[in-house]
A protein has these predicted regions:
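Conserved catalytic core of nucleotide polymerization and phosphodiester-bond processing enzymes
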Residues: 1-190
Length: 190
């Protein structure tokens, strides 16, 4: 595997964790990117190639829908927040409500908090625009505060050229180049 070529003389693989590795402030990983190890297939489980040295343990962590949790916090989206508190899988809940596969519901959940419209959704899910709009309408009926937060965040970034994150970090936007549509993703990811 390509990972073998990156091991040191002790057969250890090291990566670089970049604490502010993206413009939005999201953690990133490089050389190699161990945040993007391929998912298991029927043929091969890529993660099985990673083995801890004797006396050590490998740890794998998942943020468990952290972006959706932050979006609920910022938007005061109580309906979804209650589902999270009750241990529900929000992607499965959305899938059931819209009568679609979980993978499509996940795209809608994340798409909505980043401002996806019917045009982009229809392309992502390979469905007609009318159906995409129906999904979005139903979704916004279920979780109306996300639409409110998206509008408020974009207007604030457009007016002031900056947003402040819960960490105190400030993200500046070039208003002249209309980058304020990225304000929501920076708010959630930063």
């Amino acid at each position: 595997t390509p990972y073998m070529k990156m091991m040191d003389i002790n057969n250890t693989l090291h990566c670089s964790l970049n604490l502010i590795g993206t413009i939005s402030g999201r953690l990133s990983c490089s050389n190699p990117n161990l945040q993007a190890v391929a998912r298991p297939t029927n043929v091969f489980k890529v993660k099985d190639v990673f083995i801890a040295r004797a006396g050590y343990t490998l740890v794998s962590a998942d943020y468990s829908q952290a972006e959706m949790r932050l979006a609920c916090y910022y938007a005061h989206e109580d309906t979804m927040a209650e589902l999270i508190r009750n241990g529900e899988d929000i992607h499965s809940t959305t899938a059931e409500a819209l009568d679609i596969p979980r993978s499509a519901a996940k795209r809608i959940n994340f798409g909505v908090i980043y401002g996806i419209g019917a045009e982009a959704l229809h392309k992502q899910l390979r469905i007609d625009k009318k159906t995409a709009q129906q999904y979005l309408n139903k979704y916004h009926g279920m979780y109306p505060q996300f639409r409110v937060l998206l509008g408020q965040t974009e207007r604030y970034a457009d007016q002031y050229g900056v947003i402040e994150l819960w960490t105190g970090r400030r993200r500046h936007f070039n208003v002249q180049h209309a980058y304020t549509h990225k304000a929501m993703s920076n708010l959630i990811q930063g």
